[in-house]
Amino acid sequence: MARLAGVAALSLVLVLLGAGVPRPAAAAAAKTQVFLSKLPKALVVGVSPKHGEVVHAGENTVTVTWSLNTSEPAGADAAFKSVKVKLCYAPASRTDRGWRKASDDLHKDKACQFKVTVQPYAAGAGRFDYVVARDIPTASYFVRAYAVDASGTEVAYGQSSPDAAFDVAGITGIHASLKVAAGVFSTFSIAALAFFFVVEKRKKDK
């Protein structure tokens, strides 16, 4: 009986302690919901590729620049702590592809899936040279930059024109070095088969 009472007391203590611990779900729910349409377009964003220009994943570099729009009032960037830059599918590359669907709710948006960089915000202008990642698929893209406050919440944005998108040629097929290795292996296999064929033939002749 005493043992059961001890177990019950321990369970009660654990329940009381657990009541004061924030649950992961509650913490996630506390994350600020942000809508693109509610954000001021306070950043001017530029990219080096011209409209329709093709850059190759894993090889070419895209230069991204951003600055505060000159039409913004003084102090408009007071809350800006960092700039988060993303590569986004252009409208033409989202058609009939639900997994690339754009959403006004940034937490549900699938158009801007690829991180380019996160940089501390500096008054004036910023720049980053992005080597296109090897896993970027073939598609048309534009670049979007978010100004982020101290809490990590997006408070403003800017983007290159989706209608002036550039194209990325993704890595497809077999890499050249793999082709060479496969060729060497095939040659070795044929030579080995020929050798064993000759050996077996000589054994039979004897």
From Swiss-Prot:
Heterotetramer composed of two NRT2.1, NRT2.2 or NRT2.3 and two NAR2.1. Interacts with NRT2.1, NRT2.2 and isoform 1 of NRT2.3. One of its GO terms (molecular function) is nitrate transmembrane transporter activity. It holds the Pfam family NAR2. Acts as a dual component transporter with NTR2.1, NRT2.2 and NRT2.3. Required for high-affinity nitrate transport. Involved in the regulation of NRT2.1, NRT2.2 and NRT2.3 expression, and in both, HATS (high-affinity transport system) and LATS (low-affinity transport system) activities in plant roots. Imports nitrate with high affinity when expressed with NTR2.1, NTR2.2 or NTR2.3 in a heterologous system (Xenopus oocytes). This is High-affinity nitrate transporter-activating protein 2.1. The keyword Signal applies. Keywords: Cell membrane, Membrane, Nitrate assimilation, Signal, Transmembrane, Transmembrane helix. The keyword Transmembrane applies. Residues 1-27 form the signal peptide.
